[in-house]
């Protein structure tokens, strides 16, 4: 499994949508429980800026994984790597640098 080695810009968005199973009973009572062991996986919206010559390497890395194949990434200010996929990214090309915006979705397999 490959590792995403590029540094992302500070100020990324992190979204959590816990997966919850909910049952409603006839008298208005409801019961909730987490939907499995990994019910709170996160989605990271990241931005990074790389020199133009490095942009093709980064683009190739993302294309190689194709949105379905996971890779390892260490979120900023955390000490452990997590497995993520990236099914959505875009780039803005300027004179000397290319700015990428991507969405990393945490996975367990």
From Swiss-Prot:
GO terms for cellular component: host cell cytoplasm; virus tail. The keyword Protein biosynthesis does not apply. One of its GO terms (biological process) is viral tail assembly. Pfam families: Phage_min_tail. Its main location: virion. The keyword Nucleotide-binding does not apply. It is found in: Virion; Host cytoplasm. Keywords: Host cytoplasm, Late protein, Viral genome ejection through host cell envelope, Viral long flexible tail ejection system, Viral penetration into host cytoplasm, Viral release from host cell, Viral tail assembly, Viral tail protein, Virion, Virus entry into host cell. Part of the distal tail tip which plays a role in DNA ejection during entry, and in tail assembly initiation during exit. May bind tail tip complex associated with tape measure protein and allow tail tube protein polymerization on top of tail tip. Belongs to the lambda-like tail tip protein M family. This is Tail tip protein M. It comes from Escherichia phage lambda (Bacteriophage lambda).
